UniProtKB/Swiss-Prot annotation:
This is Putative inactive caspase B. Residues 1-8 form a propeptide. Cleavage by csp-1 isoform b or ced-3 removes the propeptide and generates subunit p31 in vitro. An additional cleavage at Asp-149 generates the 2 subunits p17 and p14 but this cleavage appears to be less efficient. Interacts with ced-3 (via large subunit p17 or small subunit p13); the interaction inhibits ced-3 autoactivation. Changing D8A: Loss of propeptide cleavage. The keyword Cytoplasm applies. The gene is csp-2. Belongs to the peptidase C14A family. Keywords: Cytoplasm. It holds the Pfam family Peptidase_C14. The keyword Nucleotide-binding does not apply. PANTHER family: CASPASE 14, APOPTOSIS-RELATED CYSTEINE PEPTIDASE, MUCOSA ASSOCIATED LYMPHOID TISSUE LYMPHOMA TRANSLOCATION PROTEIN 1/PARACASPASE. Disruption phenotype: Survival of touch neurons and several pharyngeal cells is not affected during development. In a ced-3 n2427 or ced-3 n2427 and cps-3 n4872 mutant background, no extra pharyngeal cells caused by impaired apoptosis are produced. In a csp-3 n4872, csp-1 n4967 and ced-3 n3692 mutant background, pharyngeal cells, that are normally fated to die, survive and 16 percent of animals have still 1 or more cell corpses that are morphologically apoptotic and are internalized by engulfing cells. In addition, apoptosis of the male linker cell occurs normally. GO terms for biological process: negative regulation of apoptotic process; positive regulation of apoptotic process involved in development; proteolysis.
Length: 263
């Protein structure tokens, strides 16, 4: 069966699209870690949680938020969620401190990304599109932009506690998965910091929210994420005075079809 894409008049093969009807009562969860033991508070993350809750509701998802979970609680929350009824698709968002291949519970104990991915690859979720969104640092490297007019050399000296924390990490572990129908998006590149504005939230969620609100009606998820990546990468290029840091999100996909939202 073929239908027309309203955005450009192209024909879309319905067999190449995942079924994703809001009537199926799709579900999403948001894990929002802000206050940690021995780590800095993630001020501004509540702004992201509010944006995502609003966004998921508009996309037809029943969303539930969980704040300040320990490492064991993160795994148990994901386990219970993946074993419940989630409609045609599901979304899991985790916002926390992190490093390569892992993220942290508020108790400072790391959770391996591979363990979370394994929980999402269950028999009950076979052939259902699953989106895991990770909003966290993936290392302590800084993507510095080069600009010859007005670069602030002492920018990093103004946040000594933050960067001192980012240099003291648990051992990292790189993860991967070959399971189908799973897409994982990251707010930054492997090894790099993910930046967060204390009054507006993370760069990534700010742009992701705008992109999906503007384009979800006729654009599938992979293209929405690609546009989000572009906007985050170019976020401060229009600033003619100072450019200090840059950020490049990424995603990898094992989707076998296109995922459109029922909006």
């Amino acid at each position: 069966m073929m239908c027309e894409d309203a955005s450009d008049g192209k024909k879309i093969d319905e067999t190449r699209k995942y079924r994703n009807n809001r009537s199926s009562k799709c579900r999403a969860i948001i894990i929002n870690n802000v206050v940690f033991c021995g780590m800095e508070k993630r001020i501004g993350s509540d702004k992201d949680k509010k944006k995502l809750s609003k966004l998921f509701e508009r996309l037809g998802y029943q969303s539930t938020s969980y704040d300040n979970l320990k490492s064991s609680e993160i795994l148990e929350t994901v386990r219970q969620f993946t074993q419940s009824n989630h409609g045609d698709s599901l979304i899991i968002t985790i916002m926390s401190h992190g490093d390569q291949g892992l993220l942290y519970g508020v108790d400072g104990v790391p959770v391996q990304m591979l363990d979370i991915i394994d929980l999402m690859c269950t028999a009950s979720l076979a052939k259902k599109p699953k989106w895991l969104m990770c909003v966290c640092c993936r290392g302590d490297r800084i993507d510095r932009a080069v600009r010859c007019d007005g670069f602030i050399d002492n920018f990093f000296d103004r946040f000594p506690k933050f960067f001192q924390f980012m240099k003291s990490k648990f051992p990292s572990h790189q993860t991967s998965s070959s399971q189908a129908d799973l897409l994982v998006s990251f707010s930054t590149s492997p090894g790099f910091l993910s930046f967060r504005d204390e009054t507006k939230g993370t760069w990534y969620i700010q742009e992701l929210y705008r992109v999906i609100i503007e384009n979800a009606k006729d654009t599938h998820l992979a293209d929405l994420l690609m546009e989000t990546n572009r906007r985050v990468v170019e976020k401060y290029e229009a600033d003619k005075v100072v450019i200090v840091c840059k950020q490049a999100p990424e995603f990898w996909s094992r989707f076998t079809k296109q995922l459109f939202f029922d909006v």
